[in-house]
Amino acid sequence: MEGGVVHRRTVADLLEDARSRLERLGPRAALDAQVAGALVVDTRCAELRRATGVIPGSKHVPLSVLFWRADPSSGHSDPELIDFDRHIVLVCADGYSSSLAAATLRDLGFGRATDLDGGFTAWAAAGLPIEPAPA
């Protein structure tokens, strides 16, 4: 808000801005990053994960709590998430909310946060490994 005037932006504007700051990974590159030590974080809801499966070795952190889990000052942080130098690859269903979330993690100081272009849908379409969601 500048001078009391609200400048309206669309979600598409926010998404474009977020993605301009990310080096998004395709499915194969995301797998390679995971093998090299990147933390793959699945932000999808538990119901969707149960219905479609998960990326082996991924960590489930619902989008609704992701930023609190990643902020060491929040009182609700997850030790596995608060390494500001670690390569973090966020995964949502189709690669939209994960882009916005990755940009927010970058704003919090996670310089290597990015997302999976096309989300879990692209991972599955590429024929990469999927396993049942943990109970």
Language-model region placement:
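Rhodanese-like catalytic fold shared by cysteine-dependent sulfurtransferases
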Residues: 1-39, 46-87, 94-135
